[in-house]
């Protein structure tokens, strides 16, 4: 099975056929397009940890498929169906340890473990358990593209309905939430794509997204590739842009959303939400339901990953020359948490979650009401 993303291969972060997986090395973009072969879970873990692949949905799928490739190419396995189940479960636990903040990865692992456990109870041999796992991982790949397109559709319709003061809409976004962060199409950038397709997008503004520059390197690359009218700004210019009246709405993605709507996303998201609130601009999160963690009551429980000081001390997110003084201490959280009271709505593949006058969201109720369609 091949991934079903439409368009040019340059915008495929994940290239998969059964037994074969290549990941686009996003550290090299936009200057080089290089795909790395992923042969097993060790390769998958390294690719996720070292930011070859990033974006919560893409991380989950890349991890799942790295294990699918490993078991597809096993020359032999000396064990029972229960042994195969244990083997797969341990590999999934290992993959989850690569990046702790994005809930999609742990959510995918939980769902895949359920598939494995069920298969082990009915399978006659280990190979049948492996086959069940491979098929489940491939379904996740297909489902991600489908859910992203639904997010784009719901988001575009909602914005057109609520932003009625102008015929054209200008959107500010942060980090990268497009085809490069998912299996295809994107979440927040998917909404921008849908608005552009509908003919109502005036312009998209994207932040550079320091220190790893996902905005300048990746989002700008996607927008230019698709001829979407876009402007790159410095992270520190966002408030001035809002004050100038050039932003109608802010849309970002999410790595983990708590039950009350508190949202962990790329560092700098909180800044944008505060500025948007001050300027009376609606601030939306676009994310699949797999990014929602109902086990967490609020964002205070979200574990925030801290990354290498080198990403701040050197250019290109740590890959280039040193620009800061040796000996300076560094604080480099990869994410921050935006409180729910700053968020206007959460756009999902099942519709837009709103607060209905409250300070926080009742996401559990939304999930319950839409569970029949999941």
Swiss-Prot record:
Catalytic activity: 5-(methylsulfanyl)-alpha-D-ribose 1-phosphate = 5-(methylsulfanyl)-D-ribulose 1-phosphate
Positions annotated as active site in the UniProt record: 255 (proton donor)
Cellular localisation: Cytoplasm; Nucleus
A Pfam family this chain is assigned to: IF-2B
Main localisation: cytoplasm
Biological role stated in the UniProt entry: Catalyzes the interconversion of methylthioribose-1-phosphate (MTR-1-P) into methylthioribulose-1-phosphate (MTRu-1-P).
Key words of the record: Amino-acid biosynthesis, Cytoplasm, Isomerase, Methionine biosynthesis, Nucleus
Transition state stabilizer, annotated site positions: 175
GO molecular function per UniProt: S-methyl-5-thioribose-1-phosphate isomerase activity
Pathway it works in: Amino-acid biosynthesis; L-methionine biosynthesis via salvage pathway; L-methionine from S-methyl-5-thio-alpha-D-ribose 1-phosphate: step 1/6
InterPro entries listed in its UniProt record: IF-2B-related (IPR000649), IF-M1Pi (IPR005251), IF_2B-like_C (IPR042529), Initiation_fac_2B_a/b/d (IPR011559), M1Pi_N (IPR027363), NagB/RpiA_transferase-like (IPR037171)
Organism for this UniProt entry: Nicotiana tabacum
Stated name of the protein: Methylthioribose-1-phosphate isomerase
Broad class of enzyme this protein falls into: isomerase
Protein family: Belongs to the eIF-2B alpha/beta/delta subunits family. MtnA subfamily.
Biological process (GO), any one: L-methionine salvage from methylthioadenosine
């Amino acid at each position: 099975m091949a991934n079903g993303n439409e368009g040019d291969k340059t915008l495929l972060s994940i290239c998969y056929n059964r037994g074969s997986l290549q990941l686009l090395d996003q550290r090299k973009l936009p200057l080089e397009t290089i795909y790395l072969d992923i042969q097993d879970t060790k390769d998958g873990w390294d690719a996720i940890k070292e930011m070859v692949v990033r974006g919560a949905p893409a991380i989950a799928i890349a991890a799942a498929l790295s294990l699918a490739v490993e078991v597809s190419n096993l020359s032999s396995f000396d064990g029972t169906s229960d042994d195969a189940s244990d083997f797969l479960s341990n590999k999934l636990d290992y993959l989850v340890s690569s990046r702790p903040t994005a809930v999609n990865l742990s959510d995918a692992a939980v769902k895949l473990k359920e598939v494995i456990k069920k298969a082990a109870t009915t399978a006659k041999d280990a190979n049948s358990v492996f086959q069940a796992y491979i098929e489940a991982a491939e379904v996740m790949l297909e489902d991600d593209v489908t859910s992203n397109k639904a997010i784009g559709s719901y988001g575009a319709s909602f914005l057109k309905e609520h932003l009625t003061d102008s015929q054209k809409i200008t959107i500010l976004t942060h980090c990268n939430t497009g085809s490069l962060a998912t299996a295809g199409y994107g979440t927040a950038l998917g909404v921008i794509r849908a608005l552009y397709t509908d003919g109502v997008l005036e312009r998209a503004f994207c932040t550079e997204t320091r220190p790893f520059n996902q905005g300048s390197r990746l989002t700008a690359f996607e927008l230019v590739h698709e001829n979407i009218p876009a402007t790159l700004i410095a992270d520190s210019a966002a408030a001035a842009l809002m004050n100038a009246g050039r932003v109608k709405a802010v849309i970002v993605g999410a790595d983990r959303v708590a039950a009350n709507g508190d949202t962990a996303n790329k560092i700098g998201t909180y800044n944008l939400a505060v500025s948007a609130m001050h300027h009376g601009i609606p601030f939306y999160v676009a994310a699949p339901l797999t990014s929602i963690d109902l086990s967490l009551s609020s964002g205070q429980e979200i574990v925030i990953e801290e990354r290498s000081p080198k990403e701040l001390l050197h250019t290109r997110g740590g890959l280039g020359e040193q620009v800061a003084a040796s000996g300076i201490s560094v604080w480099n959280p990869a994410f921050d948490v935006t409180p729910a009271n700053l968020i206007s709505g959460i756009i999902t593949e099942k519709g837009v979650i709103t607060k209905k006058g409250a300070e926080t969201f009742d996401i559990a109720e939304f999930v319950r009401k839409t569970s029949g369609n999941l």
